[in-house]
Each structure stands twice: as C-alpha cells, then as structure tokens.
C-alpha cells in the first residue's frame, strides 16, 4: 500500500470513528426547540409558560408533580398523611436530596418556599393556590406539616404546579438567571436569544435520566422552525408553530408527530373593567361575532376543539356551552345597537408571539370589523405582553392560551388581568375548594363553567392541541400536555 493510500485509509478510519462518536454523543444529548424564550427562569415569580417548559421537573421539583397522563404523584414528598378533618397535611420528605449547589434540601426549605409563595408581598403568578394555607410547621428535617384554614380537596394538585416548586433561600437572589433546584438536570448556560443548556445531575436523589445533556433552542419564526427541523438541526420541536407543515413531517420517515391534548383554553381575553367591555351586551356581541371554526381552520389548520367556557373538553366535568355564543353576526350587530354602539367602536387587540395569537388575531379582527368593531392590532414580544397586558392591564382585547391545569379558579380573582369581579362566583370557588365529594365537585365545576359562559367574561375560542414533532428515534416525550413542561426525565433515544 502506498504511503498516500495508507494515509487516506487512516483518514477514512478516523472519520468513521468520529462519526460513530458523534452518533454516540447524539444518543445521550438532545436539542429541543420551542417558539418562546422565557423572560427568566424563576417559575415562582412569573406567569410565562416558557419558564416551566425548561425547568419543570428538570431543574426544579415540588412536593408533588404531574405525570404525562395528568396524574399527580409523589415528588420531593415521598408520602403524606391527612388528618380526619382535612385541615392538616403531614408530608414526609425524600431523604438524601441535595440542591445543585450541594446543600441539603430539608423541611426548612419547604417552609421557606411555601411561606414565600403565600406572603403578602409575593409575586407568585398563582398566589391564590396558597391562599388557604394557615401555617407551615417544620417537625424535623424530613417532616413538614401544612395546616389549612379550611379543607382543600385541591391541595396535592396545587402543589404539583410549577409555581409551587421548592427553592433554597440562599439562591433566590440569582434564581432568574442561575436557577438552583433539586432536579435531575442542572443549569449550565443561557445564551440570550439562542439557547439554554442543561446537564445531567450526577447527585440526583432519584432515578438517573437517560440523557446526559439537553439544549433548549429558541426559534420564534415558523419558517425558520420548519427549516431547522427539516435540516435536523434540532431533534424535536415542542408545540410546532406552523401547523400547515405537520402533514409534511407526518409523511417523512425521519420524523413522527406527537398530537395530543393540552390544558390550553385559547381565549379572546376581554378587559372587563375597560369601557365598553364593562357592558355585558358588548361582550356578548363580541362572542357572537366570532366564528370559532374559521379560526381553528384558518389559524390552526384544523388542530383545536371549539370551547364555550374556560374548561378543557377532555375533563370529565366538561359541558358543551358553545351554543351560548354561536356565530351570529346579525345578533352581534343588534346587541351592539342595544348597548348604544350602533355605529361600532374602536379598541386595541394586543397579540403575543405564538402563531395561534398572531394568525388568529388577523382572522378575529376581520370578523369583528364585519360587525362594526375595529380592533387595532399591536404585535408584542412576550415580555412586552406580560408587562402591558398581564401586569399592567393596559389593553382592550388580547388572545392567549391559558395552559395551566384546571385553572377556572382564576375567574374568582378580581385583580386578575381580565378583571372579572363576581362575588357569587368567588363564593362558588370557595365552596368548591372545601368540597371533596366528586359528585358535588362536578356539579360545582359545571355551574362555574355555565356562569362565566353566560356572563361572556371572555371570548372562548378553542382548546389548543398539542402538536409536537420529533425525530423518529426520540422516545418518552409527552404526547399530551397536562401542564406546561418539557419533561426530560423520561426522554431517551431508541436503541
């Protein structure tokens, strides 16, 4: 063999080895794309679902947690006892749990986290989840007692939310940019506008995940999302933003579709304290001006289920109330005239980044214009939407998908961004919280759905479908989305 041929053969062998090493690396690492970049990484102080996409069950954990099928199971609490009167929950914590900085996780951290979430000055977006807690008592390093003001059949469910994760007091100052949790993955790096990197936690208290490293890649543009997936620059895309491309992925043997349900009630949110939306007749007119199916077909290419209230159709307590707000432009015009707006009016329609909002907003604006309502569209980045709409309540209309699980209770919060204030509804939610009987709870949930539907608090559009795309070898990604999360702990590559 000539020197040159031998050199070429050696080069080929080295290239093959490098290729095999690359393949091996790819089978322990994963890159998952998502459309929205989180504003920061503290799930206990903001409503952005993109935060939980990255950190839920990966970096941070709570006493309980959601599984992909929606069930609530043990998390940092390995077990619990409930007193006969339902007022005391004694949680027994997992042993050997450490935070990523090496410090031990104890009952003191649980008390700190729950007290911080329910404090008067708490910035927790779901502070209401903790409102019924009367006291949190440390019994010993691995036992904590949560005392309630009244029985709460939802407590274990509430503690599974991303807003209820356990954090260490000494890490709070840096939590937004350098999160330190107890989860199976540690935070490594955040390149703003590009990606977040996580690595497997070698000291994790539970079962070790199959993945050694994960990268969350942020791709906001639907065209760029399609290009990245087709080029295999990413291994999966959670909630793919261009549903019109899904059939192409389905026909490509390199990929698979993960189509399921979410908790995302997509609504035309209405500022109930801003004239003229403080008038129920105007809100009712809005509801009858909207053709839900046209929005689902035009913006979502058929992926979505019409809803008539703020409740998921796959929930056993769901009732179909879409008939309360059927598409009827003539009725919408008559209601506007009755409300004193025969000539219509102008309002704002502030839209966050997701394609359901941007594409749906264009369709809705045209539908409203047909009955005399002129919606001036303003496209916002997610951080702007949170500041102007969610916190500032400076809007007339907006479109957003509420992806939190079983969140009809937000309508009992008069300070919530759409500012619906109904004492009777608030009383109903209080009674629901104190009720554990499943038959009674179903009846109350159905009453709650009916009340907000008949009050036309918001325009109820559709239940968002889970539409993710992954390479054929990716296993264990959630098909359904019982909460906002990309849970890495069960993801692996096929052998």
Model regions: which residues?
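Detector for C-terminal structural segments
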Residues: 27-30, 191, 289-317, 355-365, ...
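N-terminal lobe/hinge region of extracytoplasmic solute-binding protein
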Residues: 33-84, 115, 180-182
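A structural "hinge/loop" feature
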Residues: 37-53, 76-77, 103, 125-126, ...
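Aromatic- and charge-enriched surface segment that lines or borders ligand/interaction sites
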Residues: 79-123, 139, 145, 276
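Surface-exposed binding/hinge segments that line
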Residues: 92, 126-169
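Alpha-helical secondary-structure segments
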Residues: 106-113, 141-147, 183-184, 211-213, ...
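Gly/Pro-rich hinge or "lid" segments in bacterial periplasmic/extracellular proteins
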Residues: 157-209, 213, 221-223, 330, ...
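Ligand-site clamp/hinge motif
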Residues: 173, 201-247, 374-376
